[in-house]
């Protein structure tokens, strides 16, 4: 009988990170700095409102300053950009996110690129991704992509070493697929990465070679049990929403077929796996930004 897969509990790992962050926030406050995290919400999408309120609740719990900025759904490009400029200049704000998706009439790329890279809480600003491309082994002094960092932290905090492992990533989105390889191939992590997607023809063959599979395509159950090497670690970041025809309620499906858990050695639940880690690492980026700013000011280089 196969041994049950070990659960990669994102809630427990995120709680540990938040406990560590609370200590770091207390040290900053003792030096007169309260890390400030801000969100920009345009419109009143219920899912976005819920996500934003959750971020603020958790940041306040660890002692951070919470700054919530909202604009109506018909806000102009100029109005949104003016708010971005305001947060860039606000010394009380150390990092912020623009909640996506934005209303369709707005130029999302132009807005995101206007964010001060030092205050990029998501870690997805082109400047910060460029720095990551150029930096294989040196110290990182810019925000890191939250979800990819969350995947790695979740494994490492469960005693799983990625060094020498073959990681197959399914999905080519910027949030995870295209960025996680930049972190996994750093010398400090030392994994080998194969990037696949919904258009990959020999996907099953590649998946069967993987020590670790990261499902991030947003394609329901694209990773089947037959695709998984026995003992592999499975991290499910994919989200597909479907309406249950019987109840009429929305149901979330991941990229990894639940039957794969019987073959895997490690598996992250979805939800409850990488999701909580993303929020914890978002707050980490902001606390680190506050620490860097204070260090620069103390050294007279700010």
From Swiss-Prot:
Alphabetically ordered keywords of this record: Amino-acid biosynthesis, Histidine biosynthesis, Hydrolase, Methionine biosynthesis, Multifunctional enzyme, NADP, One-carbon metabolism, Oxidoreductase, Purine biosynthesis
Domain of life of the native organism: Bacteria
Pfam families the UniProt entry points to: THF_DHG_CYH, THF_DHG_CYH_C
Gene Ontology MF annotations: methenyltetrahydrofolate cyclohydrolase activity; methylenetetrahydrofolate dehydrogenase (NADP+) activity
Pathway: One-carbon metabolism; tetrahydrofolate interconversion
Classification via InterPro entries: Aminoacid_DH-like_N_sf, NAD(P)-bd_dom_sf, THF_DH/CycHdrlase, THF_DH/CycHdrlase_cat_dom, THF_DH/CycHdrlase_CS, THF_DH/CycHdrlase_NAD-bd_dom
BP term (GO), one: L-histidine biosynthetic process
Keyword hit for Protein biosynthesis: no
Reactions listed under catalytic activity: (6R)-5,10-methylene-5,6,7,8-tetrahydrofolate + NADP(+) = (6R)-5,10-methenyltetrahydrofolate + NADPH; (6R)-5,10-methenyltetrahydrofolate + H2O = (6R)-10-formyltetrahydrofolate + H(+)
Entry GO CC: cytosol
Enzyme Commission designation: 1.5.1.5, 3.5.4.9
Positions that bind NADP(+): 171-173, 198, 239
Family membership noted in the UniProt record: Belongs to the tetrahydrofolate dehydrogenase/cyclohydrolase family.
Subunit field text: Homodimer.
Purpose: Catalyzes the oxidation of 5,10-methylenetetrahydrofolate to 5,10-methenyltetrahydrofolate and then the hydrolysis of 5,10-methenyltetrahydrofolate to 10-formyltetrahydrofolate.
Name recorded for this polypeptide: Bifunctional protein FolD
UniProt organism field: Arthrobacter sp. (strain FB24)
Taxonomic path: Bacteria, Bacillati, Actinomycetota, Actinomycetes, Micrococcales
Gene that specifies this protein: folD
């Amino acid at each position: 009988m196969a041994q049950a897969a070990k659960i990669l509990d994102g809630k427990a790992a995120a709680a540990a990170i938040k406990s560590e962050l609370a200590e770091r926030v207390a040290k900053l406050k003792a030096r007169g700095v309260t890390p400030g995290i801000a969100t920009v919400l345009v419109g009143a999408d219920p899912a976005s409102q819920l996500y934003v309120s959750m971020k603020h609740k958790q940041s306040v719990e660890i002692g951070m300053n919470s700054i919530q900025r909202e604009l109506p759904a018909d806000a102009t490009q100029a109005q949104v950009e003016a708010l971005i400029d305001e947060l860039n200049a606000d010394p009380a704000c150390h990092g912020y996110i623009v909640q996506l998706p934005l209303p369709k009439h707005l130029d999302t790329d132009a807005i995101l690129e206007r964010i001060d890279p030092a205050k990029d809480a998501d870690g997805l600003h082109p400047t910060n991704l460029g720095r990551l491309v150029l930096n294989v082994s040196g110290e990182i002094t810019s925000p890191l992509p939250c979800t990819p960092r969350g995947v790695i932290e979740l494994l490492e905090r469960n005693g799983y070493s990625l060094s020498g492992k073959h990681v197959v990533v399914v999905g080519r989105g910027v949030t995870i697929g295209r960025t996680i390889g930049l972190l996994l191939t750093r010398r400090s992590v030392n994994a080998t990465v194969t990037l696949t997607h919904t258009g990959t023809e020999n996907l099953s063959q590649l998946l069967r070679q993987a020590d670790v599979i990261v499902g991030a395509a947003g394609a329901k159950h694209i990773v089947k049990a037959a695709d998984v090497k026995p003992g592999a670690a499975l991290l499910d970041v994919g989200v597909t929403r479907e309406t249950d025809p019987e109840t009429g309620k929305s149901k979330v499906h991941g990229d990894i077929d639940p039957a794969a858990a019987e073959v895997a050695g490690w598996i992250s639940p979805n939800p409850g796996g990488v999701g909580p880690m993303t929020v914890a690492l978002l707050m980490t980026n902001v606390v680190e930004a506050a620490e860097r700013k204070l260090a620069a000011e103390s050294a007279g280089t700010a």
